[in-house]
Amino acid sequence: KDLNHEISIVVINDASSQQIVDTYPNIENINSIEIVNMKENRGHARCIASGLKYIFEKKEFDFVIPMDGDGEDRPEEIKNFIELSKQNSEKSIVGERVKRSEGLIFKVCYQFHKFLTLAFTGKSIKFGNFTCLSKITVKKMLEEKATWSSFSGSLKKVENDLLSTPSIRGKRYVGPSQMSFFNLLKHFLSIISVFRKTVLIR
């Protein structure tokens, strides 16, 4: 609410067959809603990369805000991105997780994952997909092949000077969180692969 900006939504459907409620409250700020259907679910990174490619090639925009549509990325935090983007129109912004909704054991494992990522790559990555990307950054991301396998790793690789804003992980609208220990391990390895040359040197 109360956003003096033109916002368009592009939904990338990752081949989901789950039924959704097609009522949309509080859409007075929304200029358009478009759904792009993927033929098969190829994972978060490829889904986001496909969305970025589609928007870059077919839309006019100043910023793109990739986010999960399951509630874990809270829509109310979009205003924080917009306010911060006014300060610098060329820098991209990341939502740094300050609070997670999973159990204690998973939170400990997640902190360990962040420590190992820093130890192996020399990069501190405290963000996920929920970001606000400038047009310049989107172009850089699409030129980086690793974007199709690791969004956060590739963003950290192509942009060293990122702004940040606190982000609280929300609760899913439907069902439990999909981030299992196995998925966390895959996430860690995908980031490591982005910086594999650095890892070998270290």
Where in the sequence are the language-model features?
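Short helix-capping segments at alpha-helix termini
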Residues: 2-4, 27-32
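Short beta-strand/loop segment that forms part of the nucleotide-sugar
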Residues: 5-16, 36-38
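Extended hydrophobic secondary-structure segments that form protein cores and membrane-embedded regions
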Residues: 8-13, 63-69
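A conserved acidic beta->alpha catalytic loop
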Residues: 13-21, 40, 71-72
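Hydrophobic helical membrane-anchoring modules
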Residues: 26, 152-202
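Acceptor/aglycone-binding surface of glycosyltransferases and processive sugar-polymer synthases
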Residues: 39-40, 44-54, 63-66, 75-149, ...
